[in-house]
Design a protein with these regions (language model features):
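C-terminal peripheral helix-coil segments that are non-catalytic and often amphipathic
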Residues: 124-128, 165-204
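Generic hydrophobic, amphipathic alpha-helix propensity
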Residues: 1-10, 26, 51-55, 59, ...
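Hydrophobic alpha-helical connector segments
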Residues: 50, 64-91, 145
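Short secondary-structure transition hinges
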Residues: 89-123, 130-138, 142-143
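Helix-turn-helix
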Residues: 4, 12-46, 50
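Short, well-structured alpha-helical segments
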Residues: 78, 123, 141-149, 169, ...
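Hydrophobic recognition helices of helix-based DNA-binding modules
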Residues: 51, 55, 59, 63, ...
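Hydrophobic/aromatic residues within well-ordered alpha-helical segments
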Residues: 44, 51, 55, 59, ...
């Protein structure tokens, strides 16, 4: 039951927001009693912490798999991003803004873990991209890691990319494209354009 609560809470927090979605809402949606919920999670803060642990386990600890698949490293990243989109059911940065505002310690812990995850992801990405002959050899790795992580954090700051002007997933995929454009050589550019065409045709 505890894991079921965490999974459902993650889905609803991502959809409605960490502050907006209440414990009463969760009880109602799951059809369980308040007693059952509070036996497992005495406070909403406890639930938010458990949800973060679960989300980090799903994303950060499996970061190596993000570049894996049957296609090129570029295609694999796009395909795996689609899987993330389906799993987390998130369509706005609002949940992250609420987490930062109302659960600041949890947010800070998330930022630390994501920074570590970003660094591991870049290592795996570059390793595979170089092996496939798609990336430039003269990349300043430390600078790129800092740049990548900083832009990811900047994206989550409210009003940096106003969602009325820059829809959430359009922003995500535009950033992915630009991150790759910095890395690719001539061969990699052709592959990136091929993958973008697949995505535009909804084949990814």
């Amino acid at each position: 039951m505890k894991e079921e609560i965490v999974k459902r809470a993650l889905n609803d927090f991502m959809q409605y927001g960490f502050k907006t979605f209440t414990m009463d809402d969760l009880v109602s949606k799951m059809g369980i009693s308040k007693k059952t919920l509070y036996e497992h999670f005495p406070s909403k803060n406890d639930l938010v912490e458990a949800v973060l642990d679960y989300a980090l386990d799903m994303s950060c600890k499996n970061v190596d798999a993000f570049v894996q698949g049957d296609g090129s490293v570029i295609e694999n990243v796009y395909r795996n991003q689609e899987k993330v989109k389906e799993i987390f059911n998130i369509n706005s940065d609002r949940p992250i803004w609420e987490l930062q505002k109302y659960y600041s310690k949890t947010y800070e812990r998330m930022e630390i873990e994501f920074a570590k995850s970003d660094a591991r992801f870049i290592d795996k990405l570059l390793e595979k991209g170089w092996k496939e002959g798609l990336f430039r050899e003269d990349i300043n790795v430390n600078f790129y890691k800092t740049f990548y992580s900083s832009v990811q954090r900047l994206r989550s700051v409210a009003n940096t990319f106003p969602e009325r002007e820059f829809p959430f997933w359009d922003t995500i995929y535009t950033l992915i494209e630009y991150f790759f454009r910095i890395l690719v050589n001539e061969k990699g550019m052709k592959e990136l354009e091929h993958v973008l065409q697949l995505k535009n045709n909804k084949l990814i």
